[in-house]
């Protein structure tokens, strides 16, 4: 891999763009020879000086801003530029168009190599309801859920029905991640507040409500290799303090949560969770690497969702799990880049 081969693309227009900056900081440190391109919240793209990226502080809470005028007004313009020709893009994007298949389609149309899943699998994974249906079809246990549609009254009625059957709910965006926009519904008052706030965001943001399962929270990475083999990484366990949720602050700022890698669960549960994650990865048609969130209830592991471009920050689960199995981050990144090139070559 030469200095001219790789472009780390990060930032983006989604509400997960700050996590993307933190991922890019970590990836750029491990791949010092790569170029770094920043997509601003307005969609414009500009090469980012490495020193600027490295010096940016409080990435989870502060937007990165580059001085001057953007090099290209849009990602399409950047990908059409001569600077993109023949490059391999390492996608350090999270959420929105960076993870829902939009960016992937733009790269595919131009025959450019990129890491992670293709556009079709990305779109499937980003839609939680669609992903859950595909996982269930593959034999994975899921929980009852309902998409919240209509006005606040209709949403409240749907929440009340689900609440009556299950006693506690989780409400979250159908297309989103990093625990942004998460609501825990424990009673009528919570249901009313969630219905009002979700209705205020419709139709721009679609939400689903699903039954809450009491149990152990696990998350499991799955990694593809050049030899065609696929493996589950060691499970991570999330312990949440009473009264808190594994929301953005818990996930990235460490408030009220404890992460354990490897998870401290019985071997049979550990292996069942790994098998579930591999099944979900395959059911969605994913490539490269994913991370699947699971809750282990009284009846065993239950599928929640799959992240097709999981975080690679210093605090993220994939780096934790790679370290737990004894794999350094650089060889993992290099293999993902090699997989990206191999896919591009197959599709030519």
Which sequence ranges carry the predicted segments?
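ATP-dependent carboxylate activation and anion-phosphoryl transfer catalytic cores
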Residues: 266-348
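Phosphate-binding site of ATP-dependent enzymes
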Residues: 186-268, 272-275, 296, 301-302
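Active-site nucleotide/adenylate-binding loops and adjacent lid/helix of ATP-dependent enzymes
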Residues: 2, 6-10, 14, 82, ...
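Hydrophobic beta-strand scaffold residues
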Residues: 113-114, 142, 169, 329
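Generic enzyme active-site microenvironment
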Residues: 115, 170, 208, 291, ...
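ATP-binding N-terminal substructure of ATP-dependent carboxylate-amine bond-forming enzymes
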Residues: 1-120, 124-126, 130, 148-157, ...
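Solvent-exposed alpha-helix faces
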Residues: 25-26, 196, 278
């Amino acid at each position: 891999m030469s200095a001219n081969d790789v472009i780390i693309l990060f930032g983006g227009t989604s509400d997960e763009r700050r996590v993307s900056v933190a991922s890019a900081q970590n990836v750029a440190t491990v791949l010092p020879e790569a170029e770094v391109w920043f997509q601003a919240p307005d969609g414009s793209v500009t090469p980012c000086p490495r020193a600027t990226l490295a010096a940016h502080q409080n990435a989870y809470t502060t937007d990165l801003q580059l001085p001057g005028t953007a090099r290209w007004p849009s990602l399409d313009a950047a990908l059409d530029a001569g600077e993109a020709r023949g490059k391999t893009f390492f996608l350090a994007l999270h959420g929105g168009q960076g993870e829902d298949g939009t960016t992937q389609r733009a790269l595919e149309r131009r025959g450019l190599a990129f890491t992670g899943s293709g556009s079709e699998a990305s779109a499937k994974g980003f839609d939680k309801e669609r992903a859950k249906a595909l996982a269930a079809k593959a034999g994975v246990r899921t929980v009852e859920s309902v998409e919240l549609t209509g006005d606040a009254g209709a949403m409240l009625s749907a929440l009340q029905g689900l609440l009556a059957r299950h006693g506690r709910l989780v409400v979250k965006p159908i297309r989103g991640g990093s625990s942004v926009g998460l609501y825990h519904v424990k009673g009528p008052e919570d249901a009313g507040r969630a219905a009002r706030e979700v209705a205020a965001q419709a139709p721009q943001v679609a939400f689903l409500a699903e039954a809450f399962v009491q149990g152990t929270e696990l998350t499991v990475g799955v990694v593809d290799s050049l030899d065609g083999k696929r493996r589950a990484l060691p499970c991570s366990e999330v312990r949440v303090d009473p009264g808190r949720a594994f929301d953005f602050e818990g996930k990235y700022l460490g408030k009220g949560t404890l992460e354990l890698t490897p998870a401290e669960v019985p071997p049979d549960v550990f292996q069942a969770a790994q098998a579930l994650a591999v099944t979900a990865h395959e059911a969605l048609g994913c490539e490269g690497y994913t991370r699947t969130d699971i809750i282990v209830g009284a009846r065993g592991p239950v599928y929640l969702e799959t992240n097709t471009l999981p975080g690679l920050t210093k605090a993220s689960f994939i780096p934790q799990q790679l370290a737990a199995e004894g794999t350094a981050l650089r060889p993992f990144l290099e293999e993902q880049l090699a997989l990206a090139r191999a896919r591009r070559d197959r599709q030519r």
